[in-house]
Curated annotation (Swiss-Prot):
SUPFAM superfamilies the UniProt entry points to: S15/NS1 RNA-binding domain
Organismal lineage: Bacteria, Pseudomonadati, Bacteroidota, Bacteroidia, Bacteroidales
CDD domains: Ribosomal_S15p_S13e
GO cellular component, one term: cytosolic small ribosomal subunit
General function of this protein: One of the primary rRNA binding proteins, it binds directly to 16S rRNA where it helps nucleate assembly of the platform of the 30S subunit by binding and bridging several RNA helices of the 16S rRNA. Forms an intersubunit bridge (bridge B4) with the 23S rRNA of the 50S subunit in the ribosome.
Stored InterPro entries: Ribosomal_uS15 (IPR000589), Ribosomal_uS15_bac-type (IPR005290), uS15_NS1_RNA-bd_sf (IPR009068)
Originating gene: rpsO
Gene Ontology BP annotations: translation
Name of the protein this chain belongs to: Small ribosomal subunit protein uS15
Keywords from the named record: Ribonucleoprotein, Ribosomal protein, RNA-binding, rRNA-binding
Source taxon at top rank: Bacteria
Family the UniProt entry places it in: Belongs to the universal ribosomal protein uS15 family.
GO molecular function: rRNA binding; structural constituent of ribosome
Length: 89
């Protein structure tokens, strides 16, 4: 599978405050970004997979809501995470 527990742990260690901090906005955004990039590659090959396309749009919306939350609460954390992950504003 493309996202196993070891990969999740690695993402949480890198972007969260610790390996067990799975609920921070940064770690969730990093996880969503990884899943979005994987689904984007999948859709390049399987362009008629409409169920995956819908789930991709839902993930992008979830990530957008988390980014909006970061803008409201701490703009510096927002700027750091979009720079680190290469997300457009």
């Amino acid at each position: 599978m493309y996202l196993d527990s070891a990969k999740k742990q690695e993402l949480f260690e890198k972007y969260g405050k610790s390996a067990t901090n799975t609920g921070s906005a940064e770690s969730q955004i990093a996880l969503f970004t990884f899943r979005i990039s994987h689904l984007t590659e999948h859709l390049k090959v399987n362009h008629k997979d409409y169920a995956t396309e819908r789930s991709l749009k839902m993930l992008v919306g979830k990530r957008r809501r988390l980014l909006d939350y970061l803008i409201k609460t701490d703009i510096e954390r927002y700027r750091a995470i979009i720079k680190e992950l290469g997300i457009r504003k």
